A protein has these predicted regions:
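RNA/tRNA-interacting regions in translation and RNA-turnover enzymes
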Residues: 31-285
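Serine/threonine-rich, low-complexity intrinsically disordered segments
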Residues: 4, 13-15, 23-24
Length: 285
């Protein structure tokens, strides 16, 4: 390792990865994990590291999206994903359609009917430093746009699409792999905090948001699980995802779930100039 690297903060126990170091917050820090003392990263070394990263990330994706039980903490997963993105950026020839950087979400479960999204459900782009944030702003302005930013809180739960016809909730679906998700309409209808009818709504409306479990509800659920001798959920995100994807809607109803709506995806007969306008419109419904 180079003198610029930080001390190891954690060790992976998975056989496919011997160890991994979080370096200082800089772009060259991530690459220092595969950099030789001469400062040159050989293609074969990069290819090997890319394959290791993809294996661990894909494994965690399956656990995260399909079983709601990831092994990695969020900061560990983010660090691995960031390293993979940087290696692929430096070596474009290593990018493949199957890479986890080229798609989002997981495979829809066989427990629920499948739903094909009319508009693909994408994931957010990450920024881990002020430099990356400034770089994003520069790219926006270089495209001839003078932006006014809307800053929202980031809530970790399960992404969900809600579709309304004439103000009535007709379908709710998870993101799945971004193209095909799971039909969780019955469970969403059991969540008190999600409106089943909207006033003054257009003929068709689709909003997207994050179904989450508030900390108070999470603590209550964990206490109940411990009393019953069951293993408690690892964190509120896993609890929210596991609760929403229950086969019995009555279980979902008792979990205290809520939703944070962050996007107006479709709105028949209406048009908006800014994201802020769409949020104001959603609040009016």
């Amino acid at each position: 390792m180079t003198s610029e690297s930080a001390a190891p903060l954690f060790i992976f126990t998975q056989p496919e990865v011997l160890w991994y170091t979080i370096a200082k917050e800089s772009r060259r820090g991530a690459l220092s994990r595969v950099r030789q003392e001469s400062g040159t990263v050989e293609l074969e070394q990069a290819k090997k590291r890319v394959e290791e990263l993809r294996a661990v990330i894909e494994k965690n994706n399956r656990l995260y999206y399909d079983q709601d039980a990831p092994e990695l903490e969020d900061f560990e997963y983010d660090a691995l994903t960031r390293e993979l993105k940087e290696l692929e950026a430096q070596y474009p020839e290593l990018v493949t359609p199957a890479s986890p950087t080229q798609h989002v979400g997981g495979t829809p479960s066989g427990r629920f009917a499948k739903v094909t999204h009319a508009v693909k459900m994408e994931s957010l782009l990450d920024a881990f430093s002020y430099d990356e944030l400034r770089d994003f702003d520069r790219r926006v302005r270089d495209a001839g746009i003078e932006p006014e930013y809307v800053v929202e809180i980031k809530i970790d739960g399960l992404s969900c699409s809600l579709e309304y016809e004439n103000g009535e909730l007709v379908r709710a679906s998870t993101r799945g792999d971004g193209v095909v998700g799971e039909d969780v309409t019955a469970n969403v209808r059991a969540i008190k905090k999600i409106p089943k009818k909207l006033k003054n709504a257009p003929e068709f409306l689709e909003v997207r948001g994050e179904v989450y479990m508030p900390h108070e509800a999470f603590q209550h659920l964990c206490a109940e699980q411990e009393l019953q001798g069951a293993a408690p959920f690892k964190n509120p995100r896993n609890a929210a995802a596991g609760s929403l994807r229950q086969k019995d809607a009555k279980i979902t109803a008792g979990r205290g779930l809520s939703i944070f709506v962050f996007n107006l995806q479709q709105c028949e007969g209406r048009s908006f100039k800014t994201h802020h306008e769409t949020l104001d419109y959603i609040k009016s419904l």
